[in-house]
Amino acid sequence: MKVIRVKNQEEGGQVAFSLLKESLAHGAKTLGLATGSTPLTFYKEIVKSDLSFSDVTSINLDEYVGLPVEHDQSYDYFMRENLFNHKPFKENYLPNGLAKDLSVEVSRYDNLIAEHPIDFQILGIGRNGHIGFNEPGTPFDIRTHVVDLEESTIEANSRFFASKEDVPKQAVSMGIASIMESKMIVLMAFGKEKAYAVKEMITGPITESLPASVLQNHDNVIVIVDEEAASELD
């Protein structure tokens, strides 16, 4: 696991984008994408670049269950607003959180990932060490699945909704086994509240109680952290 320390989130986005450019130059065709505030500067770098993504497919990590794609807190909406409306891709895939049969949707998404092996996966990390919506206790061998969100995750996401009661309680998430099959993983973390999770991910035991710790078993992970997120590292 290689750690790159940056001054701030803007520099972090620039570093992540330079890694992506290198990956694309070596033939990467499928990007695994994340939502939330962490990758926003990375997406801004993609949007303002003159690189063409017309041959590139994207596969997102997760989507809430029950939110229409028009809802401004759906991850589909987030991706369109921050990336897809500004930079055309060959294909963009997200889980369908409105599927009538979520078990069928889980199988569909696993098949999609199998058809489009991920070359470059961008990740954030939750305060509790979750990646995607793979919460503590998630088996490392799981693939796409329906998740009951942890109270801490619901709490963290409540700032984006009118009230905590409006936050979805479930999501469809790519599984840890699928994430680990990505050829390259770039995890970004910014802010003091991520410092403990970053430290445990890098130096702690590999344990399902901190899902991101499994990344120690991957041979091509780059962690981009600002000074605050790196503050508990030696």
Swiss-Prot record:
- A GO biological-process term: N-acetylneuraminate catabolic process
For this protein, the record's PROSITE patterns field holds: GLC_GALNAC_ISOMERASE (PS01161)
GO-annotated molecular function: glucosamine-6-phosphate deaminase activity; identical protein binding
Q: Which UniProt keywords apply?
A: Carbohydrate metabolism, Hydrolase
* Metabolic or biological pathway: Amino-sugar metabolism; N-acetylneuraminate degradation; D-fructose 6-phosphate from N-acetylneuraminate: step 5/5
Catalyzed chemical reaction(s): alpha-D-glucosamine 6-phosphate + H2O = beta-D-fructose 6-phosphate + NH4(+)
Query: Which major enzyme category is it?
Result: hydrolase
**UniProt-listed Pfam families:** Glucosamine_iso (PF01182)
EC code(s) of this entry: 3.5.99.6
Sorted alphabetically, the Gene Ontology cellular component annotations on this record are: cytoplasm
Active site annotation, chain numbering: D62 (proton acceptor), N128 (for ring-opening step), H130 (proton acceptor), E135 (for ring-opening step)
The family database entries (InterPro entries) matched by this protein are listed as: Glc/Gal-6P_isomerase (IPR006148), Glucosamine6P_isomerase (IPR004547), Glucosamine6P_isomerase_CS (IPR018321), NagB/RpiA_transferase-like (IPR037171)
* Family affiliation: Belongs to the glucosamine/galactosamine-6-phosphate isomerase family. NagB subfamily.
State what this protein does: Catalyzes the reversible isomerization-deamination of glucosamine 6-phosphate (GlcN6P) to form fructose 6-phosphate (Fru6P) and ammonium ion.
- What NCBIfam families would the database entry show? nagB
From the Swiss-Prot or TrEMBL record, give the protein name: Glucosamine-6-phosphate deaminase
Q: What is the organism field in this record?
A: Streptococcus uberis (strain ATCC BAA-854 / 0140J)
Q: What is the lineage of its organism?
A: Bacteria, Bacillati, Bacillota, Bacilli, Lactobacillales
Name of the gene this protein is made from? nagB
